[in-house]
Design a protein with these regions (language model features):
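Function-dense linear segments that define catalytic or interfacial modules
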Residues: 103-107, 115, 122-132, 137-164, ...
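Catalytic alpha/beta core of large soluble enzyme barrels
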Residues: 91-96, 382-385, 541-553, 560-703
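Terminal amphipathic helices with adjacent charged low-complexity linkers/tails
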Residues: 95, 280, 360-383, 387-392, ...
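Glycine- and Gly-Pro-enriched alpha-helical subdomains that act as flexible
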Residues: 213-227, 255, 626-630
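Internal maturation/activation junctions in enzymes
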Residues: 427-451, 459, 476-578
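A glycine-rich phosphate-binding loop feature that marks nucleotide/adenosyl-phosphate handling sites
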Residues: 139-140, 153-157, 199-205, 245-253, ...
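Polar, glycine-rich mid-to-C-terminal structural blocks
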Residues: 259, 268, 272-349, 357
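Often metal-dependent polyanion-binding catalytic scaffolds in large enzymes
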Residues: 1-111
Length: 703
């Protein structure tokens, strides 16, 4: 039998007697959910002191976090949080929080936290000081900033998982490196992060081992091993571990790699739960355009001849040399056939992700560290890595640099409601300081190369969500020039104030360890942003000063500050595919369009739940186009607007109608590459029969 709140929620999908949408029913559903479910199932305490003592003494809250500033200040922060009288505006937002985030008793039947409690513990765990903690509480409760799921879920809990969303490991062509990578993957997955891994350096199937020909097994057995490992590391049974493997398009195993995702693949090679990504250089597109063959190069021979791993070489730059070098074994396939196969697999499964290698490396803020060779589980984290070396006993000879990135997103609609430049800058800085604090205090001793990379880069990933919700509320079509102009100005402003915050943080934390030789130091990165600022419509920008005539002057001033002071962080932005946290925040996901004005979700035993898009009214619902109606071209163009401002990547999902063909997917791939977009995440087809495209997405990065 359905509860009252479920009935009320379902009524929002029905027209009322007066012919209008009954959107107010969703607020009634949220209220009924509290009265009928949350309140009766919440443990009652007579005082905050009683509650705090109970949760600390029973090993549920961390004493160090809760009492970081003393109990009196903890109480004051709690009073501050509850003073907002926060109410979830949607039933799904309330349901998501209490089903997935709120702390419960041991048998899971009763709640021990409310939303405000979780917010306060999050602020306490990752604030710079008491004043910043208060600011963080305000930003989260008023909906302008929301930390990612691992951070928000685990903050302040005793014996909980880690706060970091994403990790990326590189693996070299030796057993010691492979063994270490599997161990690290298990440990990082256990702590709640999604793990991306580059397999490009692994020698291909049939290559020699110790000069014995035909002995190597290639990448697929490693993929099978990783799939089992991530299934095993299921984070205390809460959710299955998650990983993604990336392979360069010019690796000899590339076609077998793609075949593992075919619906009719042999069970011996079929990969069911591991995500796949392909790293595609510029040269691959050039060869396809000219309808030429593309050569695949043996990583074993490349490393033997060049003295460095295959992934550390630009295939585009060295392609002709590699082709003409007789010492390097190679095979060839038709380049168009490769892209056709890529589209076929994406049509069937939604995979693989695509990372445009040369686009990404042209935007690399720290080429002095190394090349960017792969991405993460959601294709938005992109940082350079350094290989580790090992002794024969498996111990590190020298630790390299691997990647971690903590995430949080700004709500574009709420940010645009701020009255002036000072308020806008303040919100950006509060979010920045929070994420910077996560980077500083996170402990990952189980993976020394990740620790070293984090300490030297201090990378963060500030993201964005609710773009379409904001446009709906403003009456601006997603696929319009005005939408692009306004969004360009918004991303410009966020980037400008975010860089300023990192400059100021140098006074506290010093420059990030890899600063010397970076594009921050030589000024080329700021120069590129200054040039991009010429496209910004001044009418929409919040960057104002009576002393400068245009935005380029502002960027020149910022360049001077970086030159004098430096930067505290190697990376600042990444736009993830926000999921659960978008519902809690009453946002549309990430920066792509909605899939329906009123989204229908299936939530376990509860069944269907209805979620209206932010800004939706009876008057404008007929004007709201879905992602499938808008199509891939306009979505790619919007992501291209954001890409120059984001120093990492953006999770770009492409949506196609049921009439789409593999040729349409290929056209979208070419458009994305030409537009300067850095990666493609999932391919989604509207037809119901292709259930394989409705994949379980990355819980870690989906905020």
């Amino acid at each position: 039998m359905k509860e009252t709140y479920q009935n009320l929620n379902s009524e929002i999908n029905l027209w009322g007697p007066d012919g209008s949408l009954q959107l107010e029913k969703d607020k009634e559903a949220a209220r009924a959910y509290f009265l009928e479910h949350v309140n009766p199932n919440t443990v009652f305490f007579h005082s905050l002191k009683e509650k705090t003592d109970y949760l600390i003494d029973n090993g549920l809250w961390s004493r160090d976090v809760v009492l970081r500033y003393g109990f009196d200040e903890f109480k004051r922060l709690m009073q501050h949080a509850y003073s907002f009288k926060f109410r979830f505006p949607t039933y799904l937002g309330a349901f998501k929080f209490y089903s997935s985030y709120a702390l419960r008793n041991e048998d899971g039947t009763r709640y021990l936290e409310r939303f405000e409690d979780r917010v306060v513990l999050t602020a306490l765990a990752f604030s710079e000081d008491l004043e910043h903690a208060e600011y963080v509480i305000t930003e989260i409760i008023e909906g302008r900033f929301q930390p990612a799921t691992p951070t928000f879920l685990n903050a302040g809990r005793a014996n909980a998982g880690g706060p970091v969303s994403c990790f990326i490991l590189r693996v070299e062509d030796n057993m010691e490196s492979i063994s270490r990578m599997v161990t690290d993957s298990l440990q990082l997955s256990k702590r709640g992060g999604g793990v991306g891994i580059s397999l490009t350096n692994i020698r291909e199937a049939g290559s020699p081992i110790k000069k014995f020909e035909g002995q190597a097994s290639g990448v697929i057995p490693i993929m099978k091993m990783l799939e089992d490992a991530f299934s095993y590391a299921n984070q205390l049974g809460q959710r299955q571990g998650a990983g993604a493997v990336y392979l360069n398009a010019h690796h000899p195993d590339i076609m077998r790699f793609l075949d593992t995702k075919r619906e009719n693949a042999d069970e011996k090679i079929r990969i069911k739960t591991l995500s796949l990504g392909v790293v595609v250089p510029d040269i691959t597109f050039d060869l396809a355009r000219e309808n030429r063959d593309m050569y695949l190069f043996s990583p074993y021979d490349v490393e033997r001849v060049y003295g460095k791993p295959f992934s550390d070489i630009s295939v585009t730059e060295h392609y002709n040399d590699l082709v003409n070098d007789e010492r390097i074994r190679k095979t060839k396939i038709n380049a168009r056939k490769f892209f056709q196969t890529l589209a076929e697999i994406q049509f069937e499964s939604g995979y693989p992700y695509i990372m445009f290698e040369d686009t990404v490396n042209r935007a690399n803020p720290a080429p002095n560290v190394g090349r960017i060779i792969s991405s993460n589980l959601c294709s938005e984290i992109m940082q350079p890595q350094v290989a580790s070396t090992f002794k024969e006993n498996g111990e590190f000879a020298e630790e390299g640099q691997d990647i971690s990135c903590n995430l949080g997103s700004l709500n574009i609609a709420k940010m645009q409601q701020l009255a002036n430049q000072d308020e806008f800058s303040h919100s950006v800085r509060v979010a920045y300081k929070f994420l910077n604090r996560v980077a500083k205090v996170t402990e990952m001793e189980s993976s020394p190369s990740v620790v070293k990379g984090n300490n030297l880069a201090r990378a963060i990933g500030l993201g964005q969500m609710n773009l379409h919700g904001w446009l709906i509320s403003e009456g601006i079509p997603y696929d319009s020039e005005e939408a692009q102009e306004r969004f360009r100005a918004y991303m410009h402003d966020v980037t400008y104030f975010l860089i300023g915050a990192s400059i100021d943080q140098v006074q506290i934390d010093g420059r990030f360890g890899n600063y010397s030789g970076s594009r921050w130091e030589d000024g080329s990165l700021i120069d590129a942003l200054a040039e991009e600022s010429k496209k910004v419509n001044l009418e929409y920008s919040r960057v104002r000063s009576p002393f400068t005539e245009d935005l380029v002057d502002h960027w020149n001033g910022l360049k001077w500050e970086v030159k004098n002071d430096g930067m505290a962080n190697q990376h600042l932005q990444a736009i993830p595919p926000t999921g659960s946290i978008s519902y809690i925040n009453n946002s549309t996901a990430s920066i792509h369009p909605v899939t329906a004005p009123i989204e229908i979700r299936k939530e376990g035993k509860v069944g269907r739940v209805y979620y209206p898009a932010y800004g939706l009214t009876s008057e404008n619902i007929s004007e709201v186009k879905t992602a499938y109606e808008i199509g891939p071209e306009a979505i790619i163009d919007m992501y291209a607007v954001a890409s120059p401002w984001v120093d990492q990547g953006l999770s770009l999902t492409l949506f196609f109608r049921d009439t789409a063909t593999t040729r349409d997917i290929n056209r979208a791939q070419v458009r994305a590459h030409k537009s300067g977009v850095k990666s493609i995440y999932y391919i989604r087809l509207v037809q119901k029969a292709l259930t394989g495209t409705q994949v379980d997405e990355c819980v870690s990065c989906m905020l």
